[in-house]
């Protein structure tokens, strides 16, 4: 795709990041309270950003096409400046739970996070870097944008003398991309989501360089 720019993150990108998260992970399939969905999405994004030391964004004009968030062990760089007191209100810490249905839907989200913890349990010392969040918009897939973003992150990790990384993904995402880029699937865990009566496969992928 022509005219794509790969750049650092800006505060103005965060709303587009949220939209890409909702589209990629289909949170709205099992969280139907719109206010709750907003809080879950923004909290997930903030947590991912605050745990990262490197972010690269692909954009064309004013539109974000994709982004990658990474962490290398030992790098103290952070992006906390994106969340100043002036915009902290956009990232509430209290969930707007109104009824039992909301509680059940939150429980589904927690199940997925617990599955990721289970996948990594006992393996933490195998890795010195990770990809916290990596999304390319559906319209921009297959155009080399994901591969370019990944290469930026690998170059960064190499500069930090990292040797192995991990990431979590699941079958809502294009996990075949990681296989095509030389990643290995180290483990997988099935999660039953009662609200949609289906299983979600979660994966731990690794890469050594």
Q: Which residue stretches match the model-derived regions?
A:
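Conserved acetyl-CoA-binding loop-helix of GNAT-fold acetyltransferases
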Residues: 136, 142-155, 180
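Conserved active-site alpha-helix within GNAT-family acetyltransferase domains
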Residues: 117, 147, 171-188
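Conserved acyl-donor/pantetheine-binding loop and adjacent beta-alpha core of acyl/acetyltransferases
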Residues: 74-129, 194-197
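Active-site rim helix/loop that mediates acceptor-substrate recognition in acyltransferases
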Residues: 34-55, 69, 118-120
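Conserved GNAT acetyl-CoA-binding A-motif
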Residues: 128-129, 157-170
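Conserved beta-strand-loop-alpha-helix junction that forms the acyl-donor binding cleft
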Residues: 132-134, 138-141, 166-176, 192-196
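Conserved beta-strand in the GNAT
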Residues: 57, 63-72, 128-135
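A short beta-loop-alpha structural element at the N-terminal edge
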Residues: 4-19, 72
């Amino acid at each position: 795709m022509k005219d794509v720019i790969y750049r650092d993150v800006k505060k103005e990108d965060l709303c587009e990041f949220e939209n890409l998260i909702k589209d990629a992970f289909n949170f709205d399939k099992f969280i139907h309270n719109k206010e709750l969905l907003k809080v879950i999405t923004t909290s997930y994004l903030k947590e991912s950003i605050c745990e990262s030391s490197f972010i690269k964004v692909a954009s064309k004009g004013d539109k974000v096409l994709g982004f990658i968030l990474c962490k290398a062990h030992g790098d103290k760089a952070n992006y906390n400046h994106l969340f100043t007191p002036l915009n902290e209100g956009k990232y509430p810490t209290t969930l707007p739970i109104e009824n039992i249905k909301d509680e059940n839907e939150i429980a589904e989200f927690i199940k997925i996070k617990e599955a990721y913890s289970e996948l990594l349990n006992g393996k933490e010392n195998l890795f010195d870097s990770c990809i916290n969040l990596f999304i390319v918009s559906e319209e921009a897939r297959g155009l080399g944008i994901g591969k370019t973003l990944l290469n930026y992150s690998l170059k960064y990790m190499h500069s930090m003398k990292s040797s192995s990384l991990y990431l979590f993904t699941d079958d809502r995402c294009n996990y075949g991309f990681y296989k095509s880029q030389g990643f290995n699937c180290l483990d997988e865990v099935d999660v039953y989501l009662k609200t949609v009566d289906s299983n979600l496969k979660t994966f731990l992928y690794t890469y050594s360089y």
